[in-house]
Amino acid sequence: MAAKLILFVCAIALVAQSVLGTGCGCCCRGCGCGCGGCGSRCCDRFCLCSNSAAPTGLSICSENRYNGDVCVCGEVPFLGTADVCGDMCSSGCGCIDYGCGDGCVGITQSCGGCGCGCGGCGGCGCGGCGGCGCGGCGGCGCCGGCGGCGCGCGGCGGCGCCGGCGGCGCGCGGCGCC
C-alpha cells in the first residue's frame, strides 16, 4: 500500500510540474530601449554599446626558429595585443584604416605589402594585400585604398597613395615616410 502511495505522489508531482511549469505568455522582458537610440553619426559624441565575446586571434608558441616572411591580412579587433619573445629580426609596414560613424568599432582595413617577390616583405600581388618591389618593405601596389610605390633598403620606405594613409619616403635601415 505504501508503494502505491509513493507512486501516486510521484505521478501527481510530474503532472503538477508540467502544468505549472508552462508560462502564461507574459514574461518580464526589457522595454527595448538601449544604446541603439544613441546616434553616433557625429564624431564629437561617440556612444558605444557592446556585449560581444572576447576576441580571439593568432597565436604561435614554440621554441623553434622560424625563417621567412609572415604576412597577415584581414580584420582585427579594435583592442588587440601582440607578444613577441626572443630575438627577432623584423621589418614591416602597413596601413590601418578605421573610422566611426556607423556604430561599428574596429579596424576596418589593414594592408601590408605581401605577395611573391624578393626582399623582406616586398613582392608582387594584387587583391587585399598588394605590392610590387624589392628591398625591405618598399613596393608599388594598389590595395583598395591602401597602395604605394617606392623602394626600401632594409627599411620601410615608399611612396604611396592610400586615401589619407599615403606618403613618400626612402628608407635605408629605417623607415621613411612623409
UniProtKB/Swiss-Prot annotation:
Q: What does this protein do?
A: This protein is one of many from the eggshell of the silk moth.
Region feature (Central domain) = 47-110
Similarity comment: family membership:
Belongs to the chorion protein family.
Designated name of the protein: Chorion class high-cysteine HCB protein 13
Region of interest: Right arm (Gly-rich tandem repeats): 111-178
May I ask which residue range the UniProt record assigns to the signal sequence? 1-21
Region: Left arm; residue ranges are 22-46
| Keywords linked to the UniProt accession | Repeat, Signal
Tell whether ATP-binding is among the UniProt keywords: no
